[in-house]
Amino acid sequence: MKRLFKYTLIALAAILVLPAAFLCGLYLTADMEQPAVTIDTAAYRVTNHGGYTTCHGSFLRRNPHGLWELYTAGPPEESGAAAGALTAGLMHYQEQVFVDQIREFVPSEGYLKFLGGMIRIFNRNLGRHVPEEYRREIYARSLYCSHDFDAIGTPYERQLNYHAAHDIGHAMSQYMLVGCSSFAAWGGASDDGKPVVGRNFDFYMGDDFARNKIVTFCRPQAGYPFASIGWAGMIGVLSGMNSEGLTVTINAAKGPVPLASATPISILAREILQHAATIAEALEIARRRDTFVSESLLVASARDGRAAIIEKTPRRTVLYEGDGEYLICTNHYQSEAFDDDGDNRENIAMTDSPHRFARLEELMAANAPLGVPAAAAMLRDQRGTGGKDIGVGNDCSVNQSIAHHSVIFKPATLQMWVSTSPWQGGAFVCYDLGAILRNPDPAAELYDSAQEIPSDTAYLARDYPRVVAYRQLGARIRRAMKAGRKADGELIETFAQTNPQNFHTWKLLGEYYLSQGDDGRAAQSFGKALEAGIPRRDELLAIERLKSECKP
């Protein structure tokens, strides 16, 4: 019996220790494939010209609308080092905001370190899935990163991992970090017969994360020059257009839970933008790369005179072309190849993606043939299907007041219009990519003020203050719940009146009243949430369950 007890203890110890040792081994042997390049950072001195800064053939400026404009050129390590030197302060700001937001999602320091270790293990082979050219550029930029966050990883490891931020947010969809809407029209569906593309990049990491948007104009050593919209440190592409009139935008979709790292979707989009001029070339590049999340890439081409959607999962790549002269893309797949896909069917049944898709269908029909001003109006639309008032910040809205950026492309003329704060409410600033590439003059304004789309004055006067107040009041109620204390009655009433059409308002109030043991008011609030309409079926079922559990 003693021997059996001894062997049982040994077996239990092995069960506990061996997996830990295995994970420790994976952690210690993680290899991000840092490039073996030597860069003399002293050679990359930043010169301030009073309005813009320059470094080694690259420059950074900020336009009157608050958009940062970065021009880079040359080999990856040179353009990367120059960009790193120019944007060092912005990179620190962006990283601080990112880390602070993650801490808000995951307040436990111990669990945060655990997640950091797991991400390191998960992404242990990430480097081999990123082309060396891009790893060299990322490494060069990382030389100018702060060491304030070295507990997370080395600057190079952190910057490489941040390129999978969209993918990680995609996997954390329950936090609603990602939920984009895009569309394209051409032929008889556009006002001049040529493609027009619009997109909202709804990647939300807090309001501060979108405060310093960067419009990058990149002339790489190899491939096509291009423009893209992102943030400091990001060399991947989220939304962009190249000199051949090819545009790429990315929209998250639902797929199997990733089990190993692969190519971040922003890196794939960068590769397409840099090396493709047609939809066929974009598809060929997409098929060569394995990605570890599911994504839709809306690609429009001036040469082809149309657009198509590359629907990609870790297992397959499908081209969806539709049967008309326009395409709409939210967060689910549309091709027949995914008709029987369980993840996609669940996505359509359970999420708000079909609601935004249906609203865009209505707007496309109402605005045909589509021009640039009408595209901006579509991107700013806050109504539900049938024009229903669903409040502000609703998941069913095309404009949820969370977009990092909104952009409109005219591939045939190489023009793009980029939104300015707040969200889509500010002016859309026009850039002529062809003119900028012909004469990248840092002393001159890069945008074309004559083509500017004015700000949405009605939104700024009426809805923007509501959004800000609504989120601030909601945060105060959540803090009261977390602290186990009663919220001020006036606070509750003001919150309810600020955004009564949005189901989130009544859901939060129901949860608050439950925390106070007031089942009657909780049930009443949950009932109002159900009456307002809830886009996500999983959320609908959860609220129905909460309401049913309230005591009479």
PLM feature segments, named:
Residues 201, 251, 310-316:
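Short beta->alpha transition motifs characteristic of CBS
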Residues 185, 300, 310:
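Short beta-strand-to-turn element immediately C-terminal to the catalytic PLP-Schiff-base lysine
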Residues 240, 244, 275-276, 313:
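Surface-exposed loop/turn and secondary-structure junction residues enriched for glycine/proline
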Residues 1-20:
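N-terminal Sec-pathway targeting helices
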